[in-house]
Amino acid sequence: MTEEFRHYTVLLKETVDGLQVKPDGVYVDCTLGGAGHSEYLLTQLNEHGHLYAFDQDQKALAHAKTRLQKYVDKGQVTFIKSNFRNIKEELAEHGVFHVDGILYDLGVSSPQLDEAERGFSYHQDAPLDMRMDQDAPLTAREVVNTYSYSELVKIFFRYGEEKFSKQIAREIERVREKQPIETTGELVEIIKTAIPAPARRKGGHPAKRIFQAIRIAVNDELGAVEESLEQAIDLLAKNGRISVITFHSLEDRIVKTMFKEYSTVQDLPPGIPVVPEEFQPELKVITRKPILPSDSELSENNRSRSAKLRIAEKIKSR
């Protein structure tokens, strides 16, 4: 693996094995990243099986093509540079309308976090960027310097669950009146200034929640997850499975709620003794509680500590 794209794959076996891979099946990795999940899945496919792999990041795609070269040569994998919110449209262009399994790893990949110039990290000084797709127009710099006080407060509360949202937004407003905020380092100092000293000393890095909130806003991450999951459930063939790894409560809530919605029997007209086919739920939830990383995985990769895996199975086609 190239040094610049070294990535630890979280919940590798649990995620892929949870799909109950059929050797001749059609599968989708919506978050290719370092290609760890894709590689493990491809080892379980025969010459009739196929994987479609999505990523917005050109570097991730280039790395994956090298890592998965033997499967590329066999024609078993197709790479798609697109946001996974376009899953249905993109697969339709390849003549694919039903698949046997879909997986999502919703964490920011380690190389993106570690690559200073991408602006995701609050540990390194870099231009305010935070775009997953480097061709996308909206950057963190634009959010920080042009969004109103009330817009910033809403983003920080909603996406970062930050209790000092108002103080931080007010400090951003004060600083940018004098000159634009250009770097992650400047933003970190502003956040530290706005948060009372006792609060800064507990609960991890003081900028963590704000950086998460801005990243989610820049990439419309929650909207993309919701849109994509709706399409993914529709794309699944009967008995097909979906595995989703989340890393914070906002994403996990979306997955949990959607799985519950699609696995619940609809309200029936009174007096019907048997649930008719049209009222049967589409999904069966496989994981009553989310699967968490093992102690051994946590000791190898501290970034996996907040990971949660949920799995569901399609039991009825629309």
Curated annotation (Swiss-Prot):
One Gene Ontology molecular-function label: rRNA (cytosine-N4-)-methyltransferase activity
Chief site of localization: cytoplasm
Record carries keyword Nucleotide-binding: no
Keyword rRNA processing applies: yes
One GO biological process term: rRNA base methylation
EC number(s) recorded for this UniProt protein: 2.1.1.199
A family per Pfam: Methyltransf_5
Family: Belongs to the methyltransferase superfamily. RsmH family.
Protein name: Ribosomal RNA small subunit methyltransferase H
Organism: Enterococcus faecalis (strain ATCC 700802 / V583)
